[in-house]
Amino acid sequence: MSERMIELKGIVKRFYIGMPNELEILHGIDLEVKRGEFVSIVGSSGSGKTTMMNIIGILDRPTEGEYQLDGVDVAKAKDKELSLIRNQKIGFVFQTYNLIGRTSALKNVELPMLYAGIGRRERKERAKELLEMVGMEERLSHNPDELSGGQK
């Protein structure tokens, strides 16, 4: 198993805003993230952080460059393989939460595990553990509108 989990080489991302206009957001980004390593992406508003995270999270593709995720060449992977990778290897905490409004905190945490094919009992136990880890053991049955911004 490779030490490198994420490897970007020469990543360029351009958006086309009508011919001949184009807007280049990422200009040849190189990044290597090793297994178990924590990385922060920081920069001013409009600097391309979200664009880069969308590429890393396989929500978008680069215009140019190479992207290897855990040894898989993302550019050459088929859609079905990319869906599996997203489900098993990539996790996102979105700025806008994307929680299901009429669903408890526990069920919102369980949902990705359902898509991963994890059984009901294990999902519930793991979701409880995760919520307890962040001090939300008293909020398991609360819906998103009953949670603070930080709890969401």
Give, region by region, the residue ranges found by the protein language model.
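ABC family nucleotide-binding domain
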Residues: E3-K152
